[in-house]
Structure formats: structure tokens, C-alpha cells
């Protein structure tokens, strides 16, 4: 059985050749990932739907330029993030607050903290509150670095900022996160849970629970037709 990456690559190749059905199938296969990526930057469902529609229009218009079809989904994520950032800039809005998770992805790989997160509503709520209270311009860096596994260099190139700026946002974000988490967790049953893997587990949990609304899933026709 082909992997999702392989199947997406085949669909992208067919779409690049102009096959209409492939565009519809490619949209259906990637819209959940694209939707979650957009939620890393935008909070309004209306804004997300608009940004996704434009992102897919751009992706489909230039799909023939994609050198490696199997990398379509990763390429699409970059388009979505850039389009969401453009949307914020053009509409005079601010990026919803973000967070840095320090260390490396290996810090939590293989841990069972996702299970703890799933079964601990109080911990999830506390982490969500902390994440939403942090300074702006960090959430995107956090998710790209820690959940999406992008390197500092890749984040810098994607966001059009220096690597030093990325590192600075991550550093100060983590300090704030750790301070607020320590204060919020005192006296609670999850006191002592390491904040870095806990937030990483939360991001993975939320990604698994994230589902694109019907209004987003059903715009295929207008995207392809455009």
C-alpha cells in the first residue's frame, strides 16, 4: 500500500498533467493538513477559509512547476503559511500569540505524553491558556520548529527573517512559557510535568482532533475552476 506522501505525489503528477479529477482528489487528500496549518496563524474561520482558497488556487496554478510531486503537501504548507501572513498584513491584523518549544524534536519522540494529554482536560486547558497569552510572532515559529520539524534555517527562509530572529523568538518564548506554566501548575495534579514535551504533546493532540469545517471541505469546485 502506498504511503500518503507517495499517493499525494501521484495525485500531484496527474493534476500537473491537467487531469480535473486529480485536482479534486488532491484537495480532499490535503485539506485537513492545510486547514490545521492555517490555524497556526489565523483564528477566524472566515479568514482561514479565504486564505485556504487563495492558497489552493496558487498551488494548483503553479503545480506544473513543482520539481518533486511527492513534496506537494510540504510545498502547500509553505504557501498556506505565507498566504495567511499576507492576509494578516493586508488586513492590518496581528498573528495570534505563539509559543516556543525549546530543545529538539527528539526530546519527546517516543514518549507517552500524548496519552496523558488526551486524558487530562485540566492540563490541556492550562496549556492552551498559556499559549494564547504569549507575545505575538512566536506561535508560527513554535509549530514549524517543533511540530512540523522544520529547522531554524528553514523557518527563517519561509518567514523571510534571519535565523537569529527565529532563535530569539524561540528563546524568549520558551522563558515566558516556562515561567507561566510553573506558576499555573502549582498545586495541580500535573505539577512537575515537563513543559516542553507537554506542549509538544498538546500540539500533536490538537492536530489529531483538528477537522476542517464542511464549508472548507466543499470549496473544491471554485478552487479548481479558478
Question: PLM features: residue spans?
Answer:
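Hydrophobic topogenic segments
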Residues: 96, 100-108, 115-119, 132, ...
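A short pre-motif secondary-structure segment
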Residues: 141-145
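A short, charge-rich alpha-helical start-of-domain segment used by transcription regulators
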Residues: 2, 6, 12-36
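Short helix-coil-helix linker/hinge
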Residues: 121, 131-139
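Structural recognition of an alpha-helix C-terminal capping motif at a helix-to-coil junction
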Residues: 36, 50-57, 61, 70-82
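Arg/Lys-rich amphipathic alpha helix in sigma70-family domain 2
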Residues: 64-68, 81-99, 172
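Amphipathic, Lys/Arg- and hydrophobic-enriched alpha-helical face
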Residues: 25-45, 62, 131
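Residues within the DNA-recognition helix of helix-turn-helix
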Residues: 30, 51, 169-172
Amino acid at each position: 500500500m502506498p504511503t500518503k506522501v507517495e499517493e499525494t505525489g501521484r495525485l500531484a503528477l496527474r493534476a500537473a498533467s491537467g487531469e480535473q479529477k486529480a485536482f479534486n482528489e488532491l484537495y480532499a487528500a490535503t485539506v485537513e493538513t492545510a486547514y490545521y496549518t492555517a490555524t497556526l496563524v489565523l483564528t477566524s474561520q472566515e479568514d482561514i477559509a479565504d486564505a485556504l482558497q487563495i492558497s489552493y488556487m496558487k498551488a494548483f496554478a503553479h503545480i506544473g512547476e513543482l520539481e518533486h510531486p511527492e513534496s506537494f503537501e510540504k510545498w502547500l504548507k509553505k504557501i498556506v503559511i505565507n498566504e495567511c501572513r499576507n492576509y494578516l498584513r493586508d488586513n492590518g491584523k496581528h498573528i495570534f500569540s505563539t509559543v516556543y518549544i525549546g530543545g529538539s524534536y527528539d526530546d519527546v519522540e517516543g514518549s507517552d505524553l500524548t496519552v496523558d494529554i488526551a486524558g487530562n482536560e485540566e492540563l490541556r486547558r492550562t496549556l492552551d491558556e498559556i499559549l494564547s497569552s504569549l507575545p505575538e510572532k512566536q506561535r508560527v515559529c513554535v509549530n514549524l520548529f517543533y511540530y512540523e520539524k522544520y529547522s531554524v534555517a528553514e523557518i527563517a527562509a519561509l518567514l523571510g527573517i534571519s535565523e537569529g530572529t527565529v532563535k530569539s523568538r524561540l528563546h524568549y518564548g520558551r522563558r515566558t512559557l516556562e515561567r507561566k506554566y510553573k506558576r499555573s501548575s502549582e498545586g495541580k495534579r500535573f505539577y512537575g510535568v515537563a513543559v516542553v514535551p507537554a506542549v509538544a504533546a498538546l500540539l500533536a493532540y490538537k492536530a489529531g482532533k483538528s477537522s476542517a469545517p464542511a464549508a472548507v471541505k466543499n470549496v473544491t469546485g471554485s478552487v479548481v475552476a479558478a
